[in-house]
């Protein structure tokens, strides 16, 4: 029996797909090379932007034709499955199972049922659409392991959901309120990942800074304390060398967290801190609950405490009511802070959010033009920052051979820059760390020589 994943959206979706893959492998399934020939197609969906949903709808249309030609099962999961639970199966009858965000604990049984149905056309299905919907909601299920086989990197979900309710964001409505994973479960996963040869982990949550989980003795552990505990667990084998985390909310970027990042050698000196906009007026309408002054204060504290820190952010343009002065404020902020990189996008109205009913929507062509200015500026800043790193000696996690030249190796730096090691480096470096000098920059990829 074969499976194939199509995963859309955020890193949490990728982690959840990896955790489901672990279950399938343990049950004897094998990974198919493509979606066209699998027995089970699992589509893990995203609802953050309408473009992500449209891509899924397009793929469902494609697979509708394929399903008329051969037998296979389609399982829809993720945020879109939660948001459009009933409607989407009515529109696309090819979907055999829709599993919402809070029914994921049923997946092991559903996988067994699909295997039985593949073997026997007369098998009576238990987990019909109505039955799944009527099952008691268990709350969010944290899988014990989210590691993709043979990978030197792994995501580790530590919390799910969001309590912030930014007016443009659908996430709290599809993922629910914040739930923190128990400390001991997280540390057990760290131990298992170390035994599997994982060298780098990324802690995940919609707002990791607000983590508040209990340890084995019932004590409440906040995010800085959790990071310290994870670092001490990693010390035991020295296998996991780099620890990352995302996403963070500026209101929760505490001095204690900044000091912990500075103090712990395993914590990567890279912080992703979404600002979303440079105008206080727009931030207030977004319900971001901080001001630009507060944000700049946090950035100043980060730079003063960790001089070599790299900073990335999210920027959302074209929010309802946005003026040219608001756009200028955003461009000014970018020039002042000089983010190393940014994820930039324009506003998509999401039905069910507060901003969906806001007046003064910005015309599509204006949103695109404003976003273009932001992207152009960030590209210049990123190029400047990357050129300044030429000649520096850095550590690189070597992941694989280079796609273009097998005699070269590919990896990334502590601050996430893609790097090719040239000069016939030994293949034994794959899965290990190499110390190298950044010699050239081609596009957004460094070329480096071993020291």
UniProtKB/Swiss-Prot annotation:
The lineage of its organism: Bacteria, Pseudomonadati, Spirochaetota, Spirochaetia, Spirochaetales. Residues 1-116 form the MTTase N-terminal domain. This is tRNA-2-methylthio-N(6)-dimethylallyladenosine synthase. It is found in: Cytoplasm. Its cofactor is [4Fe-4S] cluster. Transmembrane segments: none annotated. It holds the Pfam family UPF0004. Monomer. [4Fe-4S] cluster 1 binds at residues 10, 46, 79. It catalyses: N(6)-dimethylallyladenosine(37) in tRNA + (sulfur carrier)-SH + AH2 + 2 S-adenosyl-L-methionine = 2-methylsulfanyl-N(6)-dimethylallyladenosine(37) in tRNA + (sulfur carrier)-H + 5'-deoxyadenosine + L-methionine + A + S-adenosyl-L-homocysteine + 2 H(+). Binds 2 [4Fe-4S] clusters. One cluster is coordinated with 3 cysteines and an exchangeable S-adenosyl-L-methionine. One of its GO terms (cellular component) is cytosol. [4Fe-4S] cluster 2 binds at residues 162, 166, 169. Residues 387-451 form the TRAM domain. GO terms for molecular function: 4 iron, 4 sulfur cluster binding; metal ion binding; N6-isopentenyladenosine methylthiotransferase activity. Residues 148-384 form the Radical SAM core domain. PANTHER family: CDK5 REGULATORY SUBUNIT-ASSOCIATED PROTEIN 1, MITOCHONDRIAL TRNA METHYLTHIOTRANSFERASE CDK5RAP1. Catalyzes the methylthiolation of N6-(dimethylallyl)adenosine (i(6)A), leading to the formation of 2-methylthio-N6-(dimethylallyl)adenosine (ms(2)i(6)A) at position 37 in tRNAs that read codons beginning with uridine. Keywords: 4Fe-4S, Cytoplasm, Iron, Iron-sulfur, Metal-binding, S-adenosyl-L-methionine, Transferase, tRNA processing. Its main location: cytoplasm. It comes from the Bacteria. Belongs to the methylthiotransferase family. MiaB subfamily. Its EC number is 2.8.4.3.
